[in-house]
């Protein structure tokens, strides 16, 4: 079974505005390959506080905030933004 990736409207707007479709897609693909092997990616962080239950991936100055639904094999991309703005 393959993984499904759903994007919030805000994350899609940021990705399209900055022409980051390929970068984000590639980073998520790498993440899925690593977790399918049972390993933990180095650039992954489990978030706390307001973002409890979400994870963060780093790609340069860009942060990808997402939720993992392992039962449905789905990623929900909540936010994609630059480091200083993503948590606001």
Name each model-derived stretch.
Residues 1-31:
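Arg/Lys-rich, positively charged N-terminal/basic patches that mediate binding to nucleic acids
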Residues 2-9, 25, 59-62, 67-88:
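Enriched for short, Lys/Arg-rich terminal
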Residues 19, 23, 36-39, 51, ...:
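Short coil/turn residues that cap or connect secondary-structure elements
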Residues 31-34, 83:
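Conserved short hydrophobic interaction patches
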Residues 33-56:
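A short, surface-exposed loop/turn module that caps and links secondary-structure elements
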């Amino acid at each position: 079974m393959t993984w499904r990736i759903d994007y919030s409207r805000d994350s899609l707007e940021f990705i399209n505005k900055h022409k980051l479709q390929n970068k984000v897609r590639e980073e998520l693909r790498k993440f899925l390959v690593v977790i399918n092997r049972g390993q933990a990616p180095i650039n992954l962080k489990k978030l706390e506080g307001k973002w409890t239950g979400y994870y963060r991936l780093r790609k340069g100055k860009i942060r990808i905030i997402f939720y993992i639904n392992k039962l449905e094999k789905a990623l929900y991309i909540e936010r994609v933004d630059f480091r200083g703005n993503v948590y606001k």
